[in-house]
């Protein structure tokens, strides 16, 4: 190769390397990001981009992160990127600091952040290290703390919620009222309570049959089997004062301590009150072909106990196709599993606006009598299927002015207890209600059935109830049902299983064999032609 060509090659190589270096430097200063996720999980929401308009004075966000953790985990880098992007669109209203508190943890600890233990390996030696990772949002003399942050999954929701809480200097209070005798907040609703606390709400236990304070922003009524008219009167009084409520109720009570024996819920309790608001819950059970597989402990034939997995149509997996695409609660539907739901119908009252949130599939059916819910009752599950197959409503919302259920007639009484307050008006101010016809879907059973998106549904409903609609889309896009159970129809599932066997065990091996035979035939033909050519040349 001539000297001029070699010189040109060297020059071209040097210029190429220089261009790569300059491109790398430029990418640290100017960059863009393409979000290919279906839920736009890595794109700032409209609520976050417009947050500057809600901030009167500058907000300071401090991310306390130990360098030892940042060097070993990808989460902190993603968190810092998110905070910097939020700072960039805030028009100077948000200032972000990144602080390593390892040497001087006093500032972090003054905000309530505590060190977390992490196993690290250095020079072939394993040890426990104390690391910090948490975010503090400061506004004037107030602050909100987000502890133990290690991913961006729900960070945008938590940051926006914390900023708004700092500005307003108040966390919304969510009252939790357990309405079943066998359940309590401490033993059965910790997943929900913890989720509410993490989402920026202050959970507060409400005892049945007591007045609900004015500072409660929304009320969860969790179950209704142990609530009578006296208890319902206090809930009605809360709504008549403009309170918002989420009702998780049932028409049939299931006793898990007695072989899942099912009995209708007393009609004189909460259900008549809901009926006066336009929600009729039948004393029946809805079963659906879209359901969960549930492990039951049953008696083994040879004695002792065994775990039996049962396709359990009483635990209904709601299909996204049968949810409202317009209501913010379900517009970004992540999943919802209902345990022993009852059918619901709507009977509009006054000027109240109702919206159907979720329905079963079109192949659901009912148990209207002779309830059979135990694993030993499988042959009885579908006795009424032929006569009751159809689609049934299981969740709905309503907003408007509701008539008081106690405006007419004498107020209920209870011996030894003070009388409930009489309605101050015959109808409520403008308010909102959510009703789901399953009382148990928000219990801690959701963790056992891998249905923790139930809690996300309840939190989205809370945001809708307190009119924080723009936060719902942020929360919902971080929660996805990842279970491989999309095919609900039993016949379709069976057909696809057979088709999979045919393809993997039949067609694929035959294709490989056919390809091999074809290659062998081509090779033999080429060898024959080659021998013919060599013979002719000879």
Residue spans of the language-model regions?
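Acidic carboxylate-rich catalytic motifs and surrounding loops in phosphoryl-/glycosyl-chemistry enzymes
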Residues: 99-103, 207, 284-288, 475-476
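A cross-taxonomic marker for long C-terminal extensions/tails that follow the last structured domain
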Residues: 133, 142, 149, 334-343, ...
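Extracellular ligand-binding/catalytic regions of CAZymes and related secreted enzymes
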Residues: 2-60, 160-171, 280, 350-354, ...
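Conserved GHKL (Bergerat-fold) ATPase module
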Residues: 154, 184-187, 265, 531, ...
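Juxtamembrane extramembrane loops of integral membrane proteins
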Residues: 7-232, 236
């Amino acid at each position: 190769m001539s000297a001029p060509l070699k010189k040109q090659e060297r020059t071209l190589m040097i210029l190429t390397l220089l261009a790569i270096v300059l491109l790398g430097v430029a990418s640290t200063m100017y960059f863009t990001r393409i979000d290919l996720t279906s839920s736009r999980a890595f794109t700032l929401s409209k609520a976050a981009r417009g947050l500057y308009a809600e901030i009167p004075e500058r907000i300071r966000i401090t991310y306390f992160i130990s360098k030892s953790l940042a060097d070993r985990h990808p989460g902190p880098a993603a968190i810092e990127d998110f905070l910097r992007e939020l700072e960039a669109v805030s028009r100077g209203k948000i200032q972000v600091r990144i602080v390593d508190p390892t040497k001087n943890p006093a500032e972090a600890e003054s905000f309530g952040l505590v060190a977390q233990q992490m196993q690290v390996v250095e020079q072939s030696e394993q040890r426990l290290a104390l690391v910090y990772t948490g975010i503090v949002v400061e506004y004037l003399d107030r602050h909100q703390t987000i502890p133990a942050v290690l991913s961006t999954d729900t960070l945008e929701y938590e940051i926006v919620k914390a900023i708004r809480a700092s500005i307003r200097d108040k966390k919304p209070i969510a009252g939790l009222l357990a309405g079943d005798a066998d359940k309590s907040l401490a033993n059965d609703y910790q997943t929900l309570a913890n989720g509410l606390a993490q989402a920026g709400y202050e959970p507060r236990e409400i005892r049945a049959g007591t007045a609900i304070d004015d500072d409660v922003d929304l009320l969860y009524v969790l179950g209704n089997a142990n609530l009578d008219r006296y208890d319902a009167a206090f809930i009605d009084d809360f709504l008549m004062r403009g309170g918002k409520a989420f009702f998780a109720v049932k028409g049939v009570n299931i006793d898990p301590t007695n072989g899942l024996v099912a009995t209708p819920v007393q009609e004189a309790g909460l259900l008549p009150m809901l009926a006066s608001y336009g929600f009729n819950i039948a004393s029946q059970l809805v079963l659906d072909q879209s359901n969960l597989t549930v492990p039951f402990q049953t008696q083994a034939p040879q004695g002792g106990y065994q775990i039996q997995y049962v396709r359990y149509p009483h635990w209904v997996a709601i299909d996204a196709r049968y949810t409202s695409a317009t209501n913010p609660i379900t517009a970004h539907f992540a999943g919802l599993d209902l345990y022993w739901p009852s059918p619901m119908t709507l009977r509009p009252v006054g000027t109240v606006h109702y919206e159907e949130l979720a329905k079963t599939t079109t192949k659901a059916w009912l148990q209207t009598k002779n309830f059979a819910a135990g694993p030993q009752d499988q042959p009885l599950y579908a006795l009424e299927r032929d006569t009751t197959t159809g689609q049934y409503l299981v969740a709905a919302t309503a907003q408007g002015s509701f008539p008081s259920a106690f405006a007419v007639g004498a107020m209920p009484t209870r011996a030894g207890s003070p009388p409930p307050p009489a309605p101050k008006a015959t109808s409520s101010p403008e308010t909102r209600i959510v009703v789901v016809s399953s009382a148990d879907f928000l219990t801690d059973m959701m963790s056992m059935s891998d249905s923790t998106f139930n809690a996300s549904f309840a939190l989205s409903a809370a945001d809708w109830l307190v009119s924080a609609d723009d936060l719902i889309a942020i929360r919902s896009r971080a929660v996805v049902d990842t279970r491989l159970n999309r095919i609900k129809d039993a016949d379709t599932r069976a057909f696809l299983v057979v088709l999979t066997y045919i393809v993997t065990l039949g067609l694929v091996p035959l294709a490989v064999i056919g390809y091999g035979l074809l290659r062998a035939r081509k090779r033999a033909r080429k060898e024959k032609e080659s021998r013919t050519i060599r013979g002719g040349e000879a």
